């Protein structure tokens, strides 16, 4: 069963501060995928996903929500930049490649799930192959394997193998030889490249080559080989296509960068042309991929953009209509910065503490020190460009510069980063607008 909206928001809260409206929107959209699958077949086809447009300044968590969502979804997920595409007929990536790449992701996902499902059987088969190398079965004069009475010896070796007692012993095994075919093609023809590679690799016979390696490494290689044998490629493709059609999620970032600006009337192959090409895919069409035909009717699209120069109304009206749910992400405050520095599971202050601990240096961030760091980042954002939480990275790097450089010579020391320490390290740069513009 899929996670509930409350559980999804709770997971996102562990990594992203604030932006509850955006978290709720993506949580509901994810849960609706599960709800739809519980409906009768005829009604299920009629329920289409409500695509989302996330609007907010840079550095407030739009892309981070996408990254974390990919891990939670357990479904085919791809994140693309809208600026990477050009209109059909021009040099560059076409919009159709989004669905082709999503299908490739789905094939890998379904394959890894199938391999995991068969791992126990594959493990047994791999152990048998290694035991055959360690205890070769006796053969008669015609080369046929004879029934041997070494089953008890075999069980002893199997026990040792499972306990790791034979891990460092070297053996020579036959492994599948990977045929690598490198093909150079002009930009925008990646699809043809992959098809030619598949063709040439399929023409080559299944060869094996002998390799010498430690038993623990050989076991991993053989488990993967045996698991791959237990998987039906055609069945995998069908499952992958179904996973894309029913559960696929596409996150399109920088959608504001393909808005038409001003009264420019010429052809615009990487802006309005891309919007026109996106329309049928988001609305629902069929895309031909190397794995088969994929319908996009029920793929969920989440678009995001800063919209600092353009506005959502600058998008094509038809595209606006296909993104019915609008979510606005708020600019971050000083209090948000303080929470970002301390609350997430892998907060910035924790990262620096652990990094310095590897050199034997103990770092302690006091409450007033964290408050001062947050205030400095907030002030620089106000005085120069507002780049959101990314400003914390530059401020902290500047603050920790001296410690990072000298840490290897200060093993055993404890350094307390309080308000005075931050004031002394950053005051000149924060107060001087010219310096903060170029350094922070």
From Swiss-Prot:
It comes from the Bacteria. GO terms for biological process: protein unfolding; proteolysis involved in protein catabolic process. Keywords: ATP-binding, Chaperone, Cytoplasm, Nucleotide-binding. InterPro entries: AAA+_ATPase, ATP-dep_Clp_protease_ClpX, ATPase_AAA_core, Clp_ATPase_C, HslU, P-loop_NTPase. GO terms for cellular component: HslUV protease complex. SUPFAM superfamilies: P-loop containing nucleoside triphosphate hydrolases. ATPase subunit of a proteasome-like degradation complex; this subunit has chaperone activity. The binding of ATP and its subsequent hydrolysis by HslU are essential for unfolding of protein substrates subsequently hydrolyzed by HslV. HslU recognizes the N-terminal part of its protein substrates and unfolds these before they are guided to HslV for hydrolysis. This is ATP-dependent protease ATPase subunit HslU. It comes from Actinobacillus pleuropneumoniae serotype 3 (strain JL03). The gene is hslU.
């Amino acid at each position: 069963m899929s996670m509930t909206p409350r559980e999804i928001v709770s997971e996102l809260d562990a990594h992203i501060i604030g932006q509850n409206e955006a978290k709720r929107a993506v949580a509901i959209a994810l849960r609706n995928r599960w709800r739809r699958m519980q409906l009768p077949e005829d009604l299920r086809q009629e329920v289409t996903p409500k695509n989302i447009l996330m609007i907010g300044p840079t550095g407030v968590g739009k892309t981070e929500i996408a990254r974390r969502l990919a891990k939670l979804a357990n479904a085919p997920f791809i994140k693309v930049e809208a600026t990477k595409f050009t209109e059909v007929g021009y040099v560059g990536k076409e919009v159709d490649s989004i669905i082709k790449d999503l299908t490739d992701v789905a094939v890998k996902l379904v394959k890894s799930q199938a391999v995991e499902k068969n791992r126990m059987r594959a493990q047994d088969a791999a152990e048998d192959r290694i035991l055959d190398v360690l205890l070769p079965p006796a053969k008669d004069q015609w080369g046929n394997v004879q029934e041997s009475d070494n089953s008890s010896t075999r069980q002893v070796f199997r026990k040792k193998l499972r306990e790791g007692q034979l891990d460092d012993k070297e053996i020579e095994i036959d492994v599948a030889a990977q045929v690598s075919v490198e093909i150079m093609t002009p930009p925008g023809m990646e699809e043809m490249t992959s098809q030619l590679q598949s063709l040439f690799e399929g023409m080559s016979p299944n060869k094996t080559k002998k390799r010498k390696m430690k038993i623990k490494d050989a076991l991993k290689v053989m488990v993967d080989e045996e698991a791959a044998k237990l998987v039906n490629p055609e069945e995998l493709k069908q499952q992958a296509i179904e996973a894309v059609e029913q559960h696929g999620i596409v996150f399109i970032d920088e959608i504001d960068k393909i808005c038409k600006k001003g009264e420019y009337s010429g052809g615009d192959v990487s802006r309005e042309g891309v919007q026109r090409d996106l329309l049928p895919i988001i609305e629902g069409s069929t895309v031909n991929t190397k794995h088969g035909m994929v319908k996009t009717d029920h793929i969920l699209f989440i678009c995001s953009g800063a919209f600092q120069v353009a506005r959502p109304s600058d998008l094509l009206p038809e595209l606006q209509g296909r993104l019915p749910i609008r979510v606005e992400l708020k600019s971050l405050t000083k209090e948000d910065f303080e929470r970002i520095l301390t609350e997430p599971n892998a907060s910035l202050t924790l990262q620096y503490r652990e990094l310095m601990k590897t050199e034997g240096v103990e770092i302690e961030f006091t409450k007033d020190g964290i408050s001062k760091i947050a205030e400095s980042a907030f002030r620089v954002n106000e005085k120069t460009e507002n780049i959101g939480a990314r400003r914390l990275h530059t401020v902290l790097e500047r603050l920790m510069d001296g410690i990072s450089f000298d840490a290897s010579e200060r093993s055993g020391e404890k350094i307390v980063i309080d308000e005075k320490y931050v004031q002394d390290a950053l005051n000149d740069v924060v107060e001087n607008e010219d310096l903060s513009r170029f350094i922070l």
